[in-house]
């Protein structure tokens, strides 16, 4: 490995709490870690400057990893600039939706959660629990702890397409509605 690649690899490791080049693909399969540890705590724009040039250094950091992270963060301009995919176009949104290893049902729930504002998060979670008659789960003031509880609970959810659409409708958020309708139309959820 030449000097430039060694320096870039070292810079990336110093920026990340985990060695990003070795871990990102595995982290993506563990949703609570990627969203709680990375998106809630890190300066993503700083980290991102080092991830793109590092794509050639390791097969574990792929284009799909970067697109997925940018999509969750609503960084439409960067997706368009680096990957020539306009998230506001239906066909391009379908392409972006394919860049993920997260199961479709779980991904849509996670996307919906991340797209909501701080005020909407508790409403969103409470609606899910109400639908499932499991509202005994109590949320606190710590957003990170709420997220950990939420993601640990996601796999137990048995949400149908109709229930998700009802949740989306009740949030009355145009951006969420448009994004989720595209994803739902692209990939049917199993009831």
UniProtKB/Swiss-Prot annotation:
Transmembrane segments: 50-72
KW Transmembrane (keyword) present: yes
InterPro entries given in the database record: Herpes_U15 (IPR008644)
UniProt keyword terms in alphabetical order: Host membrane, Membrane, Transmembrane, Transmembrane helix
Membrane topology listed for this record: Single-pass membrane protein
GO cellular component, one term: host cell membrane
Top-level taxonomy: Viruses, Duplodnaviria, Heunggongvirae, Peploviricota, Herviviricetes
Localization terms from the record: Host membrane
Superkingdom per UniProt: Viruses
Name this polypeptide is given: Protein U15
